[in-house]
Amino acid sequence: MDNAGKEREAVQLMAEAEKRVKASHSFLRGLFGGNTRIEEACEMYTRAANMFKMAKNWSAAGNAFCQAAKLHMQLQSKHDSATSFVDAGNAYKKADPQEAINCLNAAIDIYTDMGRFTIAAKHHITIAEIYETELVDIEKAIAHYEQSADYYKGEESNSSANKCLLKVAAYAAQLEQYQKAIEIYEQVGANTMDNPLLKYSAKDYFFKAALCHFIVDELNAKLALEKYEEMFPAFTDSRECKLLKKLLEAHEEQNSEAYTEAVKEFDSISRLDQWLTTMLLRIKKSIQGDGEGDGDLK
């Protein structure tokens, strides 16, 4: 069956489902099994949704899954309702990001009501990703990553919570909310430094926290660096710590060339990602005075 054929069949199923729903509202529904008609309508909406999916009509698929979700709720089938809202969200993601978020939020409300916080957290991440990539609303992405982290923490899924918090920290720093970023990097760094499997990552978190301090105030960065070395002695021998010391020295001397040279040397072994490049450039501008210079690190 071609896509047009699938769409025609889906439209017929939708019409049949609507008839079943109307019939269930009739005066005699109690005598003739109103719930049975609703169950049949649910099944038809779901079949129609899958037909629309095969035809790649994502909005129609999302709408059909939504209709099924509402009927499942009417039947007190919370789990089935939440599943249908998630299916609707996944379909809408390809056509209408805002509607996808609405459906996923509806699913989250049901899951939290059922005490299924780990699943709710997962869907908050999906919403955050839609805000990141489709709607480009970083403040809202941050809010959903934070909510996800809260739910994961409550369920003792600390590794998953930390992943979300690190996303929050990275975006907070980009938005110049440095104190928020510092608190998260320090907290995650402290949590990971005693874990044999994760302690290698701790140096990255302390490095990022120190850079955020540096952008705000050079003295803050010096004091933070001393604190991190005391907390986590392995940090002292890391390339990140050595780079920070060179950058602090260059900044103190207002020596832009020494700063650039130190960054280039570090980058030749460990490639700088976009976030690190942005932060290092912000610090460099304070050496050059009011952002003069070529705005480059190389």
Curated annotation (Swiss-Prot):
The gene is NAPB. This is Beta-soluble NSF attachment protein. Keywords: Disease variant, Epilepsy, ER-Golgi transport, Intellectual disability, Membrane, Protein transport, Transport. It comes from Homo sapiens. One of its GO terms (biological process) is SNARE complex disassembly. Belongs to the SNAP family. It is found in: Membrane. CDD domains: SNAP. It is linked to Developmental and epileptic encephalopathy 107: A form of epileptic encephalopathy, a heterogeneous group of early-onset epilepsies characterized by refractory seizures, neurodevelopmental impairment, and poor prognosis. Development is normal prior to seizure onset, after which cognitive and motor delays become apparent. DEE107 is an autosomal recessive form characterized by onset of seizures in the first months of life. Affected individuals have severe global developmental delay, profound intellectual disability, progressive microcephaly, and hypotonia. The lineage of its organism: Eukaryota, Metazoa, Chordata, Craniata, Vertebrata. Transmembrane segments: none annotated. It is a peripheral membrane protein. Interacts with PRKCABP, and disrupts the interaction between GRIA2 and PRKCABP, leading to the internalization of GRIA2. GO terms for cellular component: extracellular exosome; glutamatergic synapse; synaptobrevin 2-SNAP-25-syntaxin-1a complex.
